[in-house]
Structures are given as C-alpha cells and as structure tokens.
Amino acid sequence: MPGKIAVEVAYALPEKQYLQRVSLQEGATVEEAIRASGLLELRTDIDLTKNKVGIYSRPTKLSDTVHDGDRVEIYRPLIADPKELRRQRAEKSANK
C-alpha cells in the first residue's frame, strides 16, 4: 500500500512568489502535484500546455513521478529571446 509524500509546488513572478505544500500518494505525477496545489485556480496565467515545468531547476515532464521532498517548479514563458538580447547588448557596447 503506497504511503504519503510531501511535495512543494513553486511559481514565481517578479512581484510575488507562490509556494504551496501538498501531500500526495506515492507514485503521483508532476501534473497531479500542480493540480493539488491549487495554483491553476489561483493563477489563470498558468497554462500547462505552454508553461514548462521542472523539479529543482531540472526540466521534467508532467507525467514524471514526484518523490518525497521534491520542489516542482512552474516556469514562466520567456518574454525575449536570450540570444537576441545578447546580440543587442554586444552591438550596443561595440558602438560606444
């Protein structure tokens, strides 16, 4: 018989951070942890078909299993391409 595990679900915005602790059955998935956290109802900007997720900064799939003590992270979409930003900064410093 599977036991209970404790997992944290995190979502960070520039102005506010959300950290929810949930208790799940062993064998639960990343998606189940996120749904149990209530963040999908609290933050309508989270779309699991678009937002990437991870466990302790390592990208993962919604179907991956969580383990006791894991921190599931929901990542915001990038608003700018990092390569493009680096190129623009390099051009700007070259023109000085």
From Swiss-Prot:
Highest taxon, organism lineage: Bacteria
Transmembrane regions listed in the UniProt entry: none
A Pfam family hit: Ub-RnfH
UniProt-listed PANTHER family: UPF0125 PROTEIN RATB
Protein family (similarity comment): Belongs to the UPF0125 (RnfH) family.
Protein name: Protein RnfH
Organism the protein comes from: Escherichia fergusonii (strain ATCC 35469 / DSM 13698 / CCUG 18766 / IAM 14443 / JCM 21226 / LMG 7866 / NBRC 102419 / NCTC 12128 / CDC 0568-73)
Lineage, uppermost ranks: Bacteria, Pseudomonadati, Pseudomonadota, Gammaproteobacteria, Enterobacterales
Gene: rnfH
